[in-house]
Amino acid sequence: MFLISKMKKKRSLLVVMMLAISMIIMTGCTNKKAYSLEKGEIFLSPTLTLGMSMEGLPEEWVQVRNLPIRTEYAGFPMEVTLEADEAGKLRSVKAISQDELTTDQQDELRKTLSQDYDLPLTAVQNREEQPRSWLMDEGGYRVDMSLLASSYGDGEVVIEVYAQPTAK
């Protein structure tokens, strides 16, 4: 009797463990977006949102003497500047890679950005001054990723998130 009870407990425990592992695998496989462009969230940090008060910025995002903030995104070192509107609200965020990135690295960065927002970055045609550039739009906000140099090869990448201008 004791042996049967012990086997049932082990079997129940095994079933529970298998269910838990399945849940972990299933949630790990879903492509959860980390940031919502529709809400103005910034890909660099869950604490940054367009329209938030510049006075309420977390300490790590406060620019000292207007110098860029150094951080990392997708494994690439970036220099970030934040811009406020007249009301003191965060209007735009610009991140520039500190190193020249190869076209493969640029594509890797683009894919990571697309995954973080769960939106495609659409290639922009007819932009001769910036031949490798992509846009993403949602909910009145835009992400613009392009090369700093006007070439198709290696170069510094600029990623800017901002509110789209409204028609007057």
Question: Model regions: which residues?
Answer:
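Bacterial N-terminal signal peptides that target proteins for export
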Residues: 4-16
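Ser/Thr-rich, low-complexity intrinsically disordered terminal regions
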Residues: 67-73, 128-138
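Short Gly/Thr-rich strand-loop-strand
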Residues: 115-135
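Terminal recognition/anchoring or ligand-binding modules at protein termini
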Residues: 133-138, 147-148, 166-168
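Short, exposed beta-strand-loop hairpins at the edges of beta-sheets
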Residues: 144-154
